């Protein structure tokens, strides 16, 4: 089967875990990994897997005679903002795993097929991939006046790139809660938990809804979205049934539904507790496969 050629830009934890997932793909063939640290473990592993590697950054990749069909970038927001127009000029489709938000944001259960022709798509954040689908599940049943998510992740799973992007995390995730999740207003909070042994990723999703909302329909919608996510992130699960509360002063006079989820990683390269990183790489792979299928069908 013909596959779309892929370059991974970045050689850190997320890029390395992504490499393992791409190796299993029926539609994507990882052929290059690009970094800036010649001693990075990611580049070493990629070389052992037969990929062409370079520590000379995006300049090296774009100087090659053969260009990839797709590039997955897991560097930092400011780096991707500079590289994105260069990818587009070279005719390379980009899947952005940073919070740069250069292109339209994609969350597979909500809008996977809406942006398959875009030159650049953004995977928002780990917290966004884990929680925005739940907000979307609620908002497709009733109006959501306000949605707030709290993403709690193991401190050990947050490398320098994640820490450098904390401000962008909250802004990009909050915007995604509104534009994709469907909430009128959204807010995102991230907690880096220093507990040892490290805790699994856990997320709380709070939605303000009308008092007369159909609770059974909301619960059913949430369960359907969870099943959709489990197709590419098997370790994604509800901790308990959605909890409904009557209007109160705290909720601004709205009734509320609160959902608790946890995300256990597949353990490809990252440990299972790093579900926050795993859901990013799994969602990016899912999006990349859809883009590749359409790209290859056009070429055929």
From Swiss-Prot:
Which SMART domains does the entry link to? Semialdhyde_dh
Catalytic activity annotation: acetaldehyde + NAD(+) + CoA = acetyl-CoA + NADH + H(+)
UniProt-listed CDD domains: ALDH_C
Which positions are catalytic residues?
Answer: 126 (acyl-thioester intermediate)
Write down the superkingdom of origin. Bacteria
Q: Which UniProt keywords apply?
A: Aromatic hydrocarbons catabolism, NAD, Oxidoreductase
Q: Name one GO molecular function term.
A: acetaldehyde dehydrogenase (acetylating) activity
Q: What family name appears in the similarity comment? A: Belongs to the acetaldehyde dehydrogenase family.
The name this protein carries in UniProt is Acetaldehyde dehydrogenase 1
Q: Which organism is it from?
A: Rhodococcus erythropolis (strain PR4 / NBRC 100887)
């Amino acid at each position: 089967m013909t596959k779309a050629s892929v370059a991974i830009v970045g050689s850190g934890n997320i890029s390395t875990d992504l490499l393992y997932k791409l190796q299993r793909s029926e539609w994507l063939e990882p052929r290059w990994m690009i970094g800036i640290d010649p001693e990075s473990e990611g580049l070493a592993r990629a070389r052992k897997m037969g990929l062409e590697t370079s520590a000379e950054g995006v300049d090296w990749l774009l100087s090659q005679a053969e260009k990839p069909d797709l590039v997955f970038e897991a560097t930092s927001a400011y780096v991707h903002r500079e590289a994105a127009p260069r990818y587009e000029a070279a005719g390379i489709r980009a899947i952005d795993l940073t919070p740069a938000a250069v292109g339209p944001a994609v969350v597979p259960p909500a809008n996977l097929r809406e942006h398959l022709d875009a030159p650049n798509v953004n995977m928002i954040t780990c917290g966004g991939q884990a929680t925005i689908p739940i907000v979307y599940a609620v908002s497709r049943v009733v109006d959501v006046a306000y949605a707030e998510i709290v993403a709690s992740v193991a401190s050990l799973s947050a490398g320098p790139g994640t820490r450098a992007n904390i401000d962008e995390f909250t802004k990009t995730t909050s915007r995604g809660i509104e534009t994709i999740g469907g909430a009128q207003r959204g807010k995102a909070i991230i907690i880096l938990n220093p507990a040892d042994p490290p805790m699994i990723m856990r997320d709380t999703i709070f939605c303000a809804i009308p008092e007369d909302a159909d609770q059974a329909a909301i619960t059913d919608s949430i369960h359907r979205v969870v099943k959709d996510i489990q197709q590419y992130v098997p370790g994604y699960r509800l901790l308990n049934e959605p909890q409904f509360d009557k209007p109160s002063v705290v909720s601004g006079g709205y009734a509320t539904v609160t959902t608790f989820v946890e995300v256990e990683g597949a353990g490809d390269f990252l440990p299972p507790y790093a579900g926050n990183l795993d859901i990013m790489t799994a969602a990016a792979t899912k999006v990349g496969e859809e883009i590749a299928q359409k790209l290859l069908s056009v070429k055929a």
